[in-house]
Each structure stands twice: as structure tokens, then as C-alpha cells.
Curated annotation (Swiss-Prot):
Amino acids binding Mg(2+): K201, D203, E204
Site, as annotated: Transition state stabilizer: K334
Gene transcribed to yield this protein: rbcL
Source species taxonomy: Eukaryota, Viridiplantae, Streptophyta, Embryophyta, Tracheophyta
Protein name, entry field: Ribulose bisphosphate carboxylase large chain
CDD domains tied to this protein: RuBisCO_large_I
Catalyzed reactions per annotation: 2 (2R)-3-phosphoglycerate + 2 H(+) = D-ribulose 1,5-bisphosphate + CO2 + H2O; D-ribulose 1,5-bisphosphate + O2 = 2-phosphoglycolate + (2R)-3-phosphoglycerate + 2 H(+)
Organism: Dianthus caryophyllus (Carnation)
Length: 469
């Protein structure tokens, strides 16, 4: 018998399988300020106690495996293991529990969202003891937050770059999203910016397809931006989607955008991946580019109520990885989003400090210290009649983005942009005068129609549009 084997035998190593809860369920544990805390919605298989299910999540997302192993004796599990420290039943749901897990900070590589997610959600979601598992929220300790650079610029720097204050920013996604030539695409960009929008946008799946290669699109969009700026005296931008098949190609596209002198580029951060996103955010910070983030694929991850990951976790991850804008739902419009829950993660994006508030889906108090904020983008099935509600719900620090609600105007793209700008300015003025947008919104829009035929035409087209499914 080797000396190593004798040593292990002397401390009582016993091969075999034992319950996770014997090691990883620790209700007496007091969390540390440096712990990463996770709130999981756990649905155990029939016959699996919640303590065992919660402990299994803690084990399989940290140091545990299915059986005891010799090498456990070569490290300190008490220092490195995850701990399920509290369990509470979910009100109104049978056999669902919120299990709180604490992870020591040493388990995670500094400045790497990729590593954080690989550990916490990388393997445990397929665990047989669980019918379903959802990560509802994370508390990122300040010690870990400070290892990330975060958004390239943030809200205040963006406003200073654009010289635009006191109102939400206005955007438009160019439609049809696929099939336009680069020149016709640039024409639509110009018309929307000339009509009064601050930004136009590539759709998330516009990359570099045969009908419109990326370099041609970038050139025509830059021409459109420069022409609109010269005619309006306002700083304009178009979210040039730099997402590509490789990180090298993505950075090459961002470099070309910088050389053209445009203010902002775009990335699909979930399909592109967090490593690519963080790399692009670092480039944008170093080279004065704003970074717009689209959340394409998010509903694959976050839509199911008992499995996957809530968008507030993806939003926190984006603030760490880096982005100046991110799509965040609308509350109104065609895409799903509950008001209080949506405002909960909107505050997590913008504010320096957010208090725990379960009514808004916030499980932990979160401090971002000096990390810049991210502008939430409201987009998806919205039009001029929604403007009062959007202004009231999202406030000034937001981007309100109308695709079909601009390009679907009966008189064309520029009048569609005019209608949206007039509606926004009317709502901001009414709010500043003390009027209640929630109660008087339709009246405010109708009053503005009297001196804007473009707005009146838009209101007539979309007066009956509702998304009720």
C-alpha cells in the first residue's frame, strides 16, 4: 500500500455514493460579502426531498460529483464548495422551491462571464434528480464586479457624445429585415434619421449575406448618417451589426466602422457569445464606439417559468460583459413583459444600487459601485399610441425603437419618423408640465395631431392595433 493510500485510509475515506445534503446543505451557513449568491427555482423529481435537490444543485455547480473520490482529500471542500443555505416553497406552485446557493469567489476567473456561467449553469440543468431548474437571480459581489470593465461608455457619456438630454432616445429597425440591397437600405436609414430619429438599426440577423455584404452596408449607412447630420444639425447613428462567424471578423468590422467615423456598432450577445461580446466591448471602449446589444435567442433561455434562466440574470451578465444599450422588452407591444418585473431588471441595468424587492423579481440587493449603466431599449410591436405609456414606464434614460411603427407609415419612412418624434416631444412636454401620461396619454397624442399631419396619419393607421394572444 502506497503512503498516499495509507494517508487516505487513515482519515477514513469511504468509497461509494452518499446523499448530497450531507455535505452541501448547510442551513446554518452565514453568507459572506464576497460570495456569489444564486436563487434557483427547483422542481425535484417525485420522491426527492427539496434539501437533497438544493444540495445537488450546489454540488453539481461547484465541487461535487456523483460519488466520493480520493482527491477530495487533497483540497479543502469547506473552502471551495457551493452551499445550499436556504430553501423556501414557491407560493401557489406544487413541488417547487426557491433554493439559495452561495459560491465562494475563488471558484471563478476574474473578468469572465463565460467562466461564471459555465460553473453555475453549465452542467446542473440536465441533472436527473430535477424535473426542472431555473436560475432566477444572482448577487454579484462588489469584489467580483470590480474585475470587469463593464459597458464601454455608459449612459452619461453617451448623452454627452450625442448632445441629447432630457428625453428618451428614438430608434428604428430597418425593415424588411432581410432582402434589401445596401443602397436601398442606406436610403431608408437616411429617410428615418432625416425625419427626426436619433438612431436606426440593423436587425439582429443582418450580418453579411449575399444580398447585402457588410462592407457595402456600412458604407451606405455612413453616407446616410453624414447626410442626415448635415441637414438636421443633430448627431445621428446607425447600429452597424458587427456580429460575425469569428471574433477576428467581428473586430475587423468594428475597426471599419470606426474608420468611417460612425458613433455606434452592434452585437448579438447571446448568439455571439460572452467571450466575443467582452472582446468587442473592450475594443469599443478603447476606440470611442458605443455598443448596442441585441438579445436574440433570449426567449429560448428565459421564457419558460420553471426552467432556464430569467432575463434579469442575462441583463446582469451583460452589464458585466459590456454594452451601452440592451433590448429589454416593452410591457406594451407584441413581445412578452410584465410591468413590475420588467422595471426590476431595467433598474438593475441603469442604477448603481438596487434593493431586494421580491415583488419586482429582485431576490438580492445588488451594488454596481462605479460600473456604468446600460440604456434599456423598448422594441417590438410599438407605435405612436404607445408613446405616452413608454415614456411613463421607461423614463428619459431609455431608447424607444419603432420599426414597423416608423416604416409602416402610409406616407413613407420620413413622415413615420416625424410622427414618432412629434409624439415623443409632446409626451415629454406634457410630463414636464405635470400632466399624467398614464391617464391623459391618448388626449396628449390627439392634441399633438392637430399640428402634425404626419402624426395624425399614423394615429389613424394604428388606432385599432392590439396584440392580444
Amino acid at each position: 500500500m502506497s503512503p498516499q493510500t495509507e494517508t487516505k485510509a487513515s482519515v477514513g475515506f469511504k468509497a461509494g455514493v452518499k446523499d448530497y445534503k450531507l455535505t452541501y446543505y448547510t442551513p446554518e451557513y452565514e453568507t459572506l460579502d464576497t460570495d456569489i449568491l444564486a436563487a434557483f427555482r427547483v422542481s425535484p423529481q417525485p420522491g426527492v426531498p427539496p434539501e437533497e435537490a438544493g444540495a445537488a444543485v450546489a454540488a453539481e455547480s461547484s465541487t461535487g460529483t456523483w460519488t466520493t473520490v480520493w482527491t477530495d482529500g487533497l483540497t479543502s471542500l469547506d473552502r471551495y464548495k457551493g452551499r445550499c443555505y436556504h430553501i423556501e416553497p414557491v407560493a401557489g406552485e406544487e413541488n417547487q422551491y426557491i433554493c439559495y446557493v452561495a459560491y465562494p469567489l475563488d471558484l471563478f476567473e476574474e473578468g469572465s462571464v463565460t467562466n461564471m456561467f459555465t460553473s453555475i449553469v453549465g452542467n446542473v440543468f440536465g441533472f436527473k434528480a430535477l424535473r426542472a431548474l431555473r436560475l432566477e437571480d444572482l448577487r454579484i459581489p462588489v469584489a467580483y464586479v470590480k474585475t470587469f470593465l463593464g459597458p464601454p461608455h455608459g449612459i452619461q457619456v453617451e448623452r454627452d457624445k450625442l448632445n441629447k438630454y432630457g428625453r428618451p432616445l428614438l430608434g428604428c429597425t430597418i425593415k424588411p429585415k432581410l432582402g434589401l440591397s445596401a443602397k436601398n437600405y442606406g436610403r431608408a436609414v437616411y429617410e428615418c434619421l432625416r425625419g427626426g430619429l436619433d438612431f436606426t438599426k440593423d436587425d439582429e440577423n443582418v450580418n453579411s449575406q449575399p444580398f447585402m455584404r457588410w462592407r457595402d452596408r456600412f458604407l451606405f449607412c455612413a453616407e446616410a448618417i453624414n447626410k442626415a447630420q448635415a441637414e438636421t444639425g443633430e448627431i445621428k447613428g446607425h447600429y452597424l451589426n458587427a456580429t460575425a462567424g469569428t471574433c477576428e471578423e467581428m473586430i475587423k468590422r468594428a475597426v471599419f466602422a470606426r474608420e468611417l467615423g460612425v458613433p455606434i456598432v452592434m452585437h448579438d450577445y447571446l448568439t455571439g457569445g460572452f467571450t466575443a461580446n467582452t472582446s468587442l466591448a473592450h475594443y469599443c471602449r478603447d476606440n470611442g464606439l458605443l455598443l448596442h446589444i441585441h438579445r436574440a435567442m433570449h426567449a429560448v433561455i428565459d421564457r419558460q417559468k420553471n426552467h432556464g434562466m430569467h432575463f434579469r440574470v442575462l441583463a446582469k451578465a451583460l452589464r458585466l460583459s459590456g454594452g451601452d444599450h440592451i433590448h429589454a422588452g416593452t410591457v406594451v407591444g407584441k413581445l412578452e413583459g410584465e410591468r413590475e418585473i420588467t422595471l426590476g431588471f431595467v433598474d438593475l441595468l441603469r442604477d448603481d444600487f438596487t434593493e431586494k424587492d421580491r415583488s419586482r423579481g429582485i431576490y438580492f440587493t445588488q451594488s454596481w459601485v462605479s460600473t456604468p449603466g446600460v440604456l434599456p431599449v423598448a422594441s417590438g410591436g410599438i407605435h405612436v399610441w404607445h408613446m405616452p405609456a413608454l415614456t411613463e414606464i421607461f423614463g428619459d434614460d431609455s431608447v424607444l425603437q419603432f420599426g414597423g411603427g416608423t416604416l409602416g407609415h402610409p406616407w413613407g419612412n420620413a413622415p413615420g419618423a416625424v410622427a414618432n418624434r412629434v409624439a415623443l416631444e409632446a409626451c415629454v412636454q406634457a410630463r414636464n408640465e405635470g400632466r399624467d401620461l398614464a391617464r391623459e396619454g391618448n388626449t396628449i397624442i390627439r392634441e399633438a395631431c392637430k399640428w402634425s399631419p404626419e402624426l395624425a396619419a399614423a394615429c389613424e393607421v394604428w388606432k385599432e392595433i392590439k396584440f392580444e394572444f
